[in-house]
């Protein structure tokens, strides 16, 4: 990743039918008569994938071709989801977590693992795919006894966390400690969206958008030949948005305490600091704009863990990356260049 290398050198839709973390918004107030004169059609379809609703939109002159492209993109999503699911028996990740070794790992898994370890280094461990034992500990504790795990349990789980415990090459992935496991939840969805967008980028396609429950990747133009307008959800006001942004070719992803939580006060949620073993208590949500959904996905999680000061400072250091953060006190903090994408209506 060019931005990773650069930083390390230096450091040595209108259709709001319910706003998710991000929602595509079409141009507002356009007359039907104007739309009727357009040479292109907007075709969109929503299916349940990767544990969320995934909507794929394609702008094309031929509706049937657009539908075929959308079908092909969903096929690619299915193929990759089968590689990265840690709950589906027999998947490569399931085998690795169960056996502690995976022979002949898929090239896609090696690519994502390499990317994840780069971000681990960049964030000083705030993003760590070996966090799975901690995430599972919290989930199982609340499911089985309805309360937080004990300090001893957390310490035991923490002993299994740390990317230095992963050894891999093109032939195998091996854990150095028994009980380790990986979760690509903070990066795989973005990666899968990126690969599906490659399917959309075909001759004759004016533009496309994939919305995967908080991870969005835009390419080209919308139906009116403009940038895709997206709404970022407010973390404490369901159904309303924090801000609007315009994207032509790029991605935006949101991580938030409200997305999956274990306590009603949102203090304990699905994101766990892999260094401390607890959910971050300073940030409600982070949305990151980057060139790819994988980068935006991982960096939004890492920034939420790092918190306002360190997180925003990190994003400001990264070329081509911008972000917006909402603290637990509902203070809104933006990176220096975020306004380039923000839209005022």
Model segments located where?
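Mature catalytic core of soluble alpha/beta enzymes
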Residues: 1-345
């Amino acid at each position: 990743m060019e931005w990773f290398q650069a930083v390390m050198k230096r450091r040595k839709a209108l259709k709001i039918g319910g706003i998710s973390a991000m929602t595509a918004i079409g141009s507002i107030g356009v007359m039907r008569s104007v739309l009727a004169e357009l040479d292109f059609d907007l075709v969109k379809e929503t299916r349940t994938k990767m544990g969320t609703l995934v909507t794929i939109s394609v702008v094309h002159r031929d509706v049937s071709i657009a539908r075929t492209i959308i079908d092909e993109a969903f096929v690619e999503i299915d193929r990759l989801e089968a590689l990265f699911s840690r709950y589906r028996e027999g998947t490569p990740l399931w085998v690795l977590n169960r056996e502690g070794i995976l022979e002949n790992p898929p090239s896609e898994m090696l690519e994502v693992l390499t990317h994840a370890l780069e971000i681990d280094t960049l964030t000083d461990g705030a993003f760590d795919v070996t966090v799975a034992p901690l995430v599972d500990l919290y989930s199982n504790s609340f499911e089985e006894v309805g309360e937080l795990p004990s300090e001893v349990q957390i310490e035991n789980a923490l002993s299994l966390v740390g990317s230095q415990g992963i050894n891999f090459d093109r032939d195998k992935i091996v854990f150095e400690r028994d009980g380790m496991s990986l979760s690509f939840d903070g990066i795989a969805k973005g990666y899968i969206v990126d690969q599906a967008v490659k399917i959309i980028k075909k001759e004759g396609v004016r533009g496309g958008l994939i919305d995967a429950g908080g991870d969005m990747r835009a390419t080209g133009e919308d139906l009116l030949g403009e940038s895709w307008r997206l709404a970022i959800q407010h973390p404490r006001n369901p159904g309303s948005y924090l801000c609007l942004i315009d994207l032509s070719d790029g991605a935006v992803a949101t991580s938030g305490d409200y997305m999956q939580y274990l306590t009603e006060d949102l203090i304990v949620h699905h994101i766990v600091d892999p260094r401390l073993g607890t959910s971050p208590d300073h940030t409600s949500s982070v949305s990151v704009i980057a060139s790819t959904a994988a980068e935006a996905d991982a960096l939004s999680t890492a920034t939420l863990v790092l918190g306002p000061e360190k997180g925003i400072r990190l994003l400001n250091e990264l070329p081509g990356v911008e972000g917006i953060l909402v603290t637990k006190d509902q203070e809104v903090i933006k990176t220096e260049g975020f306004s380039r994408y923000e839209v005022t209506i």
